[in-house]
Amino acid sequence: MAVLFTIHSDLRYEIVRKVFEGGMGIIYEAEQHGARNFVKRVAIKVIRQSYANQKQFIENFIGEAKLVADLIHTNIVQTYHLGEAKGIYYIAMELIRGVNLEQFADQLRDKQRVLPPELAVFIASRVCRGLAYAHAKLDKDGKPLGIVHRDVSFKNIMIAFEGDVKLMDFGIAKAKGFLIDNEGEVVAGKADYMSPEQANFQITDRRSDIFSVGVVLANLLLGRNIFKGLNAEESRKNVMTLPLPDFRKLDPRIDDRLNEILHRTLARDLAKRYPDADEVLHDLEHYIYHSGYGPTNETLGKMIRELFGLNTKLAAADAKGSTRLLERAARSTQTLKAKDAAGAASSTRVTRSIKVRPK
């Protein structure tokens, strides 16, 4: 496409606070400033200093930004810009004023609340909407990109205070021509959310993400991850070998149809698993809307604001008010004891793993 003209602009970001610090990167809340006092709140993601000089991490970071830049969907966190400052690459992204599913689940547990099955299914259906879009994405020549997220998990699913469900972090996704891919040689992902083919050093396709959606849905319904072991290696083995339960016996709220959906998403035999996210989405939405009315973003948003003790009017306030909401939510989710948090980390993560296939 011919270029009509070029606009040169110096973007300026002012970092407001640290939102999250993970093993590989840090996410900040920032203000993007423009002409005539224009201000937009964004999230800024940077590589941790200890990894900033490692070529593979840098290339994957850049690849993630390029890949997600054109994934514009209401259920995927949007990427605005890839930049470099003083030799450090950063990604400017949509700022989600809300919590991830891990924080959400912790708060449910703390408040001794149970998530209604219909809302659990609603959340999973929105994740499937985002995945269906990503899986179907084509390159500029009209050829499938073959995107597989490979890290669908509680920490990578956000719920905004308004009730929007957002899939984030394509940092270990695979796609043709975008990211360094040594699949089959290393295990990448969270051990108790990855698919059996991931856990077994096999090549994955979009059905791998469907298995992970099944883990997310089961976790939301039961309040626990059935594959979680004492450590990452045990979790990985559970994903490959643990017999699937009759979910109806674990929770009487799970009926025959929902039990069937869970077993089909979690099928180890790829021929028996759902072939694509669209088909999962169809069954999930039929489950919650077959009677004519079911959960909405507003339903979920109301629950999450009540759960975190957030004033509805404040949730719709200006940027500063929304920042206070984030801070209050963060404080209310700091309920795990240090030893529990450490145990959770050790038992779930082969995250962005460098676990090499045995020779």
List each language-model region with its residue ranges.
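Protein kinase glycine-rich loop
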Residues: V16-G23, I27
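Protein kinase catalytic-loop region centered on the HRD/HxD motif
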Residues: R129-I147
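AlphaC helix of the eukaryotic protein kinase fold
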Residues: R48-D70
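C-terminal lobe helix-coil module of Hanks-type protein kinase domains
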Residues: D192-L336, V356
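Activation-segment/catalytic-loop signature of the eukaryotic protein kinase fold
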Residues: L82
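Conserved short submotifs of the Hanks-type protein kinase catalytic core
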Residues: K86-N100, F104
